[in-house]
Design a protein with these regions (language model features):
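Carbohydrate transferase catalytic cores enriched for Leloir-type hexosyltransferases
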Residues: 2-497
Length: 497
């Protein structure tokens, strides 16, 4: 790949449309984190970033209002759906006579089934607004929508992602076509069954093939295959060499014999978001003492609550709770280690579900008081947990890349990880082999021993908390800057070539 000269605005003047599917979900994990990073760096390179959402709020009640009033209400409702999720339409009769609700539901189900036949969107169906039109808008101060500070405007296309998913269920791969005239590039943040028209650059992001490799992932395999096949005509961002290799072996079957170069893989930036004061301080960053309620004030004379943690006296698991993340294996290994009896805790930030897997996890946790289930945490709390942990634990069966492990390695936080290919790739970056330790997940005793060893090795950190947090912060700023610079260079090359 040719090196772009070190100018600050590679994409100045480019209008780039980015998909918002994962930003529409209730929890911002994984791909949503990648989406935010992509938006931020496109903006930093001078691009005018627009967000494609499938939310198209109800406006039938606004027809008698002035156009400008309609516009601000439409904008407000769109942003509200980005915060809370899609609002289902209800008629006035349904509101007045609740009995009619069941007929409304049947009507909406019929409408949804018709999307199975929706194969094309015209330019006139797109509706958009610029965020600069919203003067002093309260929605733009909501933490969940912080990524909008790097977005020029919102493009609404009613249920475009749902239509593409339904179409991908068909026997043949037939991507949904969209007229995107007026934009310079269209970038998806995950594989989508879409085909843009009238646009010079189309880039799809491929994170993994897990839905095809691992049946318990519970995703329709034909549908996911068609989403991946829709990536073939596009330029592609593969988030790891492992994903790139698997894509070439199983999807891009005509190019198996081609050499896979480093151009095929783009290492995404780490996800921890530091306060602006620390981001700007660089190598002079000061300590960032914990502020989360999960890390109680050590100066307090009151006894520690079971819902609190002590800095550098816990191990961290920061992932969603699903079978491939192997949390059940981890909680059993922690229980076997006996660390809970020594005051060391296991902090699990993933939100448990109502399925049988989460039920099995709960049964182990019920008998192991050293394990703390926090549920989903916000970005500030996540940063606190990373800065004050003894180590990160990631025993995944398979990963597309492994952002939690990348975050840990950038901080210089020790990470005990499974030996899947994606983790090994992170292990081989920079000096990460000093911090990332791949361990087989065939025997839980191996993990119990590793947890005991890492705890004993870093037992002194509790006595030099400020020094250790500053070391991690300064290292993170230095390493992440290198990764971000390379990321921007590769994205700019894809857009401009």
């Amino acid at each position: 790949m040719s090196i772009i000269t070190n100018t600050p605005k590679h994409l100045q003047g480019k209008r780039i449309l980015v998909t918002a599917l994962d930003l529409e979900q209730r929890e911002h994990r994984g791909i949503a984190v990648y989406s935010k990073a992509l938006i931020r760096h496109l903006r930093r390179m001078g691009a005018e970033v627009w967000l494609l959402t499938q939310f198209k709020p109800i406006t039938s009640d606004l027809r008698q209002l002035p156009k400008e009033t309609q516009r601000i209400i439409y904008s407000s409702r769109t942003l509200n759906e980005l915060v809370h999720g899609k609002t289902l339409p209800t008629s006035k009769l349904e509101q007045l006579i609740p009995f009619l609700t069941k007929f409304g539901k049947r009507y909406r189900q019929l409408r949804r089934s018709l999307k199975f036949f929706k194969t094309s969107f015209q330019l006139k169906e797109l509706r958009s607004f610029r965020l600069s039109e919203l003067s002093d808008n309260p929605n733009l101060r909501i933490n969940r929508l912080d990524y909008l500070q790097d977005v020029e405007g919102i493009v609404s296309l009613d249920d475009v992602y749902e239509a593409s998913q339904l179409t991908a269920l068909k026997k043949q791969c037939k991507p949904v076509s969209i007229d995107l005239q007026g934009f310079d590039a269209f970038i998806t943040c995950c594989p989508l069954n879409l085909k843009p028209r009238n646009i010079p650059v189309f880039i799809q992001t491929v994170h993994d093939l897990i839905a095809l490799e691992y049946a318990p992932h519970n995703e329709n395999m034909r549908q996911f295959t068609h989403r991946l096949q829709a990536c073939l005509p596009a330029k592609r961002i593969h988030v790891s060499s492992s994903t790139c290799r698997k894509f070439h072996e199983h999807i891009s079957v005509n190019s198996i014999g081609e050499a896979l170069s480093s151009e095929d893989t783009v290492v995404q930036p780490p996800s921890l978001y530091l306060p602006s004061l620390h981001r700007n301080a660089g190598g002079q960053a000061n300590d960032l003492p914990p502020s989360s309620h999960l890390l109680h004030d050590q100066r307090s004379k009151s006894k520690s609550k079971t819902s609190s943690l002590k800095p550098f006296r816990y191990l961290l698991f920061n992932s969603s709770v699903e079978a491939r993340k192997n949390l059940l294996f981890l909680v059993k290994a922690f229980a076997q280690s006996g660390l809970g009896r020594d005051g060391i805790r296991l902090c699990v930030t993933g939100k448990l579900k109502s399925d049988s897997y989460s039920k099995s996890v709960r049964e182990v946790v019920a008998n192991e008081p050293g394990i703390l289930l926090t549920g989903y945490v916000d970005e500030a709390t996540k940063l606190d947990l990373y800065l004050n942990a003894l180590a990160l634990l990631s025993p995944s069966l398979v990963e597309g890349f492994g952002i939690p492990v990348l975050d840990a390695a950038c901080l210089g936080l020790p990470a005990l990880v499974s030996s899947c290919d994606a983790h090994r790739e992170i292990h081989d970056l920079f000096d990460f082999s000093d911090y990332v330790l791949p361990i087989s997940i065939l025997e839980s005793r191996d993990w119990s021993s590793a947890m005991q060893a890492i705890t004993g090795l870093h037992n002194d950190l509790a006595h030099k908390q400020e020094e250790e947090r500053m070391r991690r912060l300064r290292r993170y700023l230095r390493i992440s800057a290198e990764i971000e610079a390379r990321f921007e260079e590769q994205i700019a090359q894809l857009v401009l070539s």
